[in-house]
Swiss-Prot record:
It is found in: Cell membrane. This is Sodium, potassium, lithium and rubidium/H(+) antiporter. GO terms for molecular function: potassium:proton antiporter activity; sodium:proton antiporter activity. It is a multi-pass membrane protein. InterPro entries: Cation/H_exchanger_CPA1 (IPR018422), Cation/H_exchanger_CPA1_bac (IPR004705), Cation/H_exchanger_TM (IPR006153). The chain crosses the membrane at residues 7-29, 46-66, 83-103, 110-130, 156-176, 182-202, 228-248, 276-296, 315-335, 364-384, 389-409. It comes from Bacillus pumilus (strain SAFR-032).
Length: 671
């Protein structure tokens, strides 16, 4: 029961962090989550979870890095292979040497091998933290790709260096030749293991499909299990589990690119399932990180052997050392390449870009998990020197780098924000065209003999939307006014429906379907769409996982009586028209007429439209609606991808989500 309650508290903290971020958007979600974790763990009766490093790596790091390997563009990483290797290998080992000697010089009680171990575990940047922080600023695309590539590789190099430094501290023996050979063996073995295991897992899934086992839920479960299987197998063999899951993610991305068209439904369901899993895992990483800090700090602050201000100074000096070393490494490499290419193919080094790279080097959960894996005793049975201090210093550096990135990255990218604001309308139009094209592409890929007619009709609808966007500019003021008037009409319909119930002209049970429909429309036209996982989206996800069928809804309630439905819908639409006319003025007259025209079409369909239950039309409309919801979800995923890749900022993503919610509202209105 305690474990269950702890999980509920953690999930509640994740949800709370996103709610808080809506009110204080200038504070990044990861920092809020760390703060909430600290707050909950600070109370004696609060939540205290001991960090098991092995469990942490397999439960959190494996699926997160697997997903990063899947979604990071392979061609762009290959083009940046030289700088990525220089950061993931060269900078890591430079950090171990420079920071290690600095730590030992500053704190003589920490032996040199242990200082190297601390420097090694501080060398990897946290790809999860980098992605979370960079999404709120306009990070240049090239820098973002470089950071992603670095984050995928330097966890392994840092942990291997940490492992050998710990071994040297525990045993007192170290061989540079043996360490170098082992590093190559562990790294290459991890990559090879990830590729081979992924290949066999993919072949196994193809084999199941050839047997006719195309159940979406089963294949998604196999996908979820994949990173855990790869990581555990690689670690059992003795190679890098981290590099194995990265290689596995890249291999699965290649398989996804080649996936047959009739598996588009699986792609959509898989994408939405992983979005939820990653949302929870990302949040848990930072909340658990915050939960560890009070306990770690208490051990040091209550120990009279340590001066509190002195250990805080140690943290600041180590952080400064890491930042200076990273800046010099990036600047010198950039300047050297610029000079070597005779200033033709490489841009001149810029201070702003170098500073962005420097402060994006956030340390995170991998660092703390590695620090907690330090053994308690040496080979002779004596305590590991300054173990608690090393863990405290690691936690302090994590906090410092996280705060520095949160404060400085938005300032360094402010100029780009202003440039984007100048042509906001143009960028929104461009993004909307890209979204509609992605929906058309999804419909084409998912087309088969069974849905060909429906897919072509829907593709034509999206092409019409695309032409409309290209013809006339988007007017935000008019659009906000239209949303307000439509919301007013929906409320008038709700009031009319309630009146019919009270007058006993309609049974309340029969009116349930329309009440639900009006409620969903009200959510989409109001600010409720800001909540990322709304009821509507949850129903869509269940539908894609084949746990909910829309035809079950059609066959129940008021929709069984076609004439009754038409009469009620006509009366509510007429009430909406009357209410809108009463609130019409010179300022909103044009928009009111537009919305009234929509309601007049509804009234006309109720009076003269074709039979609602004509079998062919019903089947066609149902298939079209299902495909349309899939296309809408594809667009939502594309918005998130554009946002995470830094191609659009928060404001543009907000406008695009409003646009998609309007599309979904139209779908609900016409069903």
């Amino acid at each position: 029961m305690e474990i269950f309650l702890a999980v509920l508290v953690l999930l509640a903290l994740i949800a709370s962090s996103n709610i808080i971020n809506r009110f204080v958007p200038f504070i990044p979600v990861p920092l809020i989550q760390v703060g909430l974790g600290i707050l909950v763990a600070a109370f004696p009766s609060g939540l205290h979870i001991s960090l098991n490093p092995e469990l942490f790596f397999v439960l959190f790091i494996a699926p997160l890095l697997f997903n990063d390997g899947k979604r990071t563009p392979r061609d762009e990483l290959w083009k940046l292979r030289a700088p990525i290797l220089l950061l993931a290998l060269g900078l890591v080992f430079a950090t171990v040497i420079v920071a290690g000697y600095t730590i030992h010089w500053m704190i003589p009680s920490i032996p040199l091998p242990a200082a190297f171990a601390l420097a090694a575990i501080l060398s990897p940047t946290d790809v999860v933290a980098v992605s979370a922080l960079s999404s709120r600023v306009n990070m240049p695309k090239g820098i973002m790709r470089l950071l992603e590539g670095e984050g995928l590789m330097n966890d392994a190099s840092g942990l291997v260096a940490f492992k050998f430094a710990i071994a040297a501290t525990v045993t007192g023996a170290f061989s540079i030749a043996e360490a170098s050979f082992s590093f190559v063996l562990i790294a290459a073995g991890g990559l090879l293991t990830g590729f081979i295991l992924s290949f066999f897992i993919i072949r196994f899934r193809y084999f199941l499909r050839r047997l006719g086992m195309d159940d979406v839920t089963m294949h998604i479960i196999l996908q979820i299990l994949t990173p855990f299987v790869i990581y555990l197998a690689a670690e059992e063999i003795g190679v890098s589990g981290i590099l194995a899951v990265v290689a596995g993610g890249v291999t699965h991305a290649i398989e996804q690119d080649r996936m047959e068209a009739n598996l588009a439904k699986l792609q959509i369901a898989s994408s939405n399932t992983w979005n939820i899993i990653l949302f929870i895992l990302n949040g848990l990483v930072f909340v658990i990180l915050g939960l560890q800090i009070p306990d770690v700090s208490t051990v040091i602050f209550q120990d009279e052997a340590f001066n509190n201000m002195q250990v805080i100074t140690y943290i600041l000096i180590i952080t400064l050392c890491l930042m200076i070393l990273r800046f010099l490494w990036v600047w010198l490499f950039w300047a050297g390449k610029w000079s070597a290419t005779k200033k033709q193919n490489v841009k001149k080094p810029k201070l702003r870009a170098s500073m962005l790279m420097t402060f994006s080097g956030v340390r995170g959960a991998v660092t703390l998990a590695g620090a907690f894996s330090i053994p308690f005793t040496l080979a002779d049975g004596s305590p590991f020197p300054e173990r608690h201090l090393i863990i405290f210093l690691a936690a302090g550096v994590i906090l410092c780098t996280l705060i520095l990135a949160s404060v400085l990255l938005p300032l360094l990218s402010e100029k780009k924000d202003k440039q984007i604001a100048v042509d906001l309308d143009t960028k929104i139009q461009h993004a909307k065209r890209k979204l509609l094209r992605s929906a058309i592409k999804t419909l084409r890929e998912g087309m088969n003999e069974d849905n060909r007619e429906v897919s072509l009709a829907l593709i034509n609808d999206y092409r019409m939307k695309l032409r409309n966007i290209q013809r006339e500019p988007y007017q935000f003021g008019m659009r906000r006014q239209e949303k307000k008037i439509r919301l007013h009409g929906i409320k008038a319909e709700q009031m009319k429906l309630q009146q019919l119930i009270e007058e006993e002209k309609i049974d309340q049970q029969e009116a349930y379907e329309l009440q639900e429909r009006f409620h969903e429309l009200e959510m989409l036209y109001s600010n409720s769409f800001k909540i990322r996982f709304s009821k509507v989206k949850f129903l869509r996800l269940l539908q894609w996982l084949q746990l909910w069928r829309p035809n079950q809804l059609v066959s129940s309630g008021i929709l069984e009586n076609e004439d009754s439905y038409k009469q009620i819908r006509k009366k509510t639409a007429e009430a909406a028209v009357d209410s809108i006319k009463q609130h019409m003025n010179d300022e909103n007259k044009q928009t009111c007429h537009q919305v009234i025209g929509f309601y007049n079409q509804v009234i006309y369909r109720c009076e003269h439209g074709p039979s609602f239950f004509q079998q062919k039309d019903r089947s066609f409309d149902r298939k079209k609606k299902e495909l349309n919801f899939q296309a809408v979800q594809t667009i939502r995923n594309e918005i998130q991808t554009l946002y995470e890749n830094g191609e659009i900022n928060r404001d543009i993503a907000h406008h695009l989500r409003e646009y998609i919610n309007d599309m979904e509202a139209v779908l609900l209105t016409n069903t």
